[in-house]
Each structure stands twice: as C-alpha cells, then as structure tokens.
Amino acid sequence: MKPLATLAALLAAAAPFASQAQDQQALYVRSLAATCANCHGTDGRAVVGSTMPALAGMPRDQLLTQLKAFKAGTRPSTIMNQLAKGYTDAQLEQIAGYFAAQK
C-alpha cells in the first residue's frame, strides 16, 4: 500500500510543473502569432476597413497551406514570403493552430 501512496504523492507534486509547461508553450505560440498583428489585427481579427484578411477562426489546414506557400515562394506577396521564411514548419503549424482556435 505504501508504494501506491508514494506514487500518488509524486503525481500530485508533478501536476503544477505540467501546467506550467503548458502555460509556457501557449505563451510561446502566442508570441509567434503576435507578429501577424501588425497587418492582420490582434489575435487575427482584422481592423474594420482593412484590406488584410482576418485570420481568426480560419480552418487550420487552409492557413497552414497558405503559410507554406508563402514560405516556398509559390504564392505571390509583398512581405509574407519574407516573413514565412523566418519560421520552421513546426512553428507555422503552431501559428495556424493558434489562429484557427481564435473565434
């Protein structure tokens, strides 16, 4: 019975660290996406009257396809090609997921 109590205590002690890691990951992804606010608005909600598309709530796969096309240079753009090249594919996936989750 004692090993079970020890295991329970260890799991309880580790829970705050798991939560902290999730918080840090969320902050990291939000900071990646913050670059987009300059043109696409805070959290991807475009400013009314802007010619820039809103990113908030767009399907993740659609966003990711566009971001990868910008990075590859197959989708013409004035600045997005340069910006997208600065991110890894994993970061682009995180950014697409972030904006897709914004409602």
Residue ranges of predicted features:
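N-terminal export/targeting leaders of redox proteins
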Residues: 1-23, 103
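Electrostatic cytochrome c docking/interface patches
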Residues: 13-33, 51, 69
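Glutamine-centric residue-chemistry signal
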Residues: 22, 58, 66, 91-94, ...
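Gly/Gly-Pro-rich "capping" loops immediately C-terminal to redox-active cysteine motifs
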Residues: 27-29, 44-71, 81, 85
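The canonical Cys-X-X-Cys-His
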Residues: 34-42, 95
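Generic alpha-helical structural context detector
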Residues: 37, 65-68, 97
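Detector for the c-type heme attachment site
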Residues: 40-45, 100-101
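C-terminal capping alpha-helices of c-type cytochrome domains
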Residues: 75, 84-103
